[in-house]
């Protein structure tokens, strides 16, 4: 029996023994015993069954949550509540190489304001929509601290674009999407001058302003078109969240506000919170974006700060802007799926206010106004626009819609509960306590024209006693609630430990079609072929325009070139292309002391540029575990002192190899090839071409065999010369490629066996 077969049998025997032990352990305790030992009830077990997703299983929905101070977006599955990914948006993130490779640095640079910003405060994500339905193509997320919007491509879950407001100094109210993704709404938060000039607070009423921006989105290019975007100048009220009209109210946008008192605290005066909540009502802003877009297209809107600005005077003259009283200090404005009603809640109230779009539109058409504000904007009387007021609990915030007609859910901050109610009849249907102090809430596809219902997630601000203590800074608590029946049922608590999520959106998982690899040599940030694409065997080092360009490749388990030599003071630009085609075979790249960390997914080309300003030896390596010999995936950047002259001589290796060593390695290679041939026979005897995953594995395995063939020729060439040192080393490299080929083949074979592949007739 040869050594390869012995090793294979040893592994198989170990797996069988492990299986028998685990089976015995599984049967050792009954469900009743487990429940008793852990103090679980039947209700607990039912909740667990509703959220449990077996190994290899998939969630029905994916949630995309803002990451707050992290500057990221968090992706998790529902109902499993398993975190799947953090998408870097406004903050550098080394695992994804975001803000570390040249390509993503350019994306971050797009969001540069007066200086470099390495932080974002993400709040409100929104999907692109087609006819009011989530289409799963792109996601938008805002940065409150630095008024910006990021565009995330859901084909690869990467940030592609960042745009910044030329007017605002903060923007809490973004992002909100119109029903066909024509525009992304983003409102100012804290009133400030629209210029970057200093303006004293004594001129607050005259020179400080708010606003709401409609960012034009090009659905074909997947990018915001800043040249076709426009902003409404608004009074210095603190604008908050927005929503776009649907169906009956299509073409209109709704933006609420607080501190319409225009109060400024500090310097001996009572705090902002006292003066900003003195009145009984604030203002809902109603904007006609469809007509505004027509004016912009007709050249009737002037540019300020390089962007179209519709002044309050022009908006009033053209009938684009109206105000309606709303409960004071509101936090959320939510349009019903059919566009007929708008629900707003005030944080200091116990009621949710339901507005009728039909009544609002009638008032606009008949010019039925109660008066104007201090800036000349028409005000529609509350009693004219209101449909109902419903008592839902103390501190209502946000509302989400169910699949059932007229049914909604409102988060109640002070009472720490969710209220289910009927907004048509004005009747409370159910309430459930959460833990603790809920902010936003999310139903499945709850912002679309056809919400799914089924589940609700309460995005709680405080966790307190829900989880194991981890110090003074607690995680956030997202609680999953079953809303499929008449009564709400709490299912699961999920800690979120990086940043404070604000809003989340959830989409059917089958609407998402993410890729698993890029075209070879791909710049993922521009979605185009990289000019630094490198193919196997074409690696090179080129000095051009004062820069040392390294055109390299990575593949299990080596980086080419493995030695890079430059002179002290030279600028180095390393461009690496991942040659892998197999799914999930990502490589990383880090260099000692150079702040370099790349994430190079299959097919991607990523670059790192830095100045080698200090002579020395700088090891580099792959940071992503990729194969058995991952640790050997290494190299050296040698930075020679200026004027250095190499010494004569050659390196001596620590191990000498003989013909016997070479023959032994060749025997192993022959045995390994026999295993590969049997796996290939299995794959080709089945309908493997019907499985894209297997096709990719086969392509990658074929590439590996090609590399193996080249290594074999080199080994045989050295053996003919009697150089068994190099012959043995290249024969060993031949075997490394074979092992990777076998690994890919066995993965393909397993996939076929587990996914119903059938034999094909010859």
Identify what each model region corresponds to.
Residues 12-20:
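Bacterial N-terminal signal peptides
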Residues 75, 561-583, 604-614, 618-619, ...:
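Beta-strand cores of secreted/periplasmic/IMS beta-sandwich domains, seen most often
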Residues 2-12:
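Bacterial N-terminal signal peptides that target proteins for export
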Residues 161, 575-605, 628-635:
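Histidine- and aromatic-enriched segments that form or immediately flank copper-ligand environments
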Residues 600-655:
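Extracellular/periplasmic metallocenter environments
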Residues 655-709, 760:
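Amphipathic, heptad-repeat alpha-helical segments
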Residues 541-571:
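N-terminal edge beta-strand
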Residues 26-541, 571, 609:
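Predominantly soluble domains enriched in secretory-pathway, periplasmic, or organellar proteins
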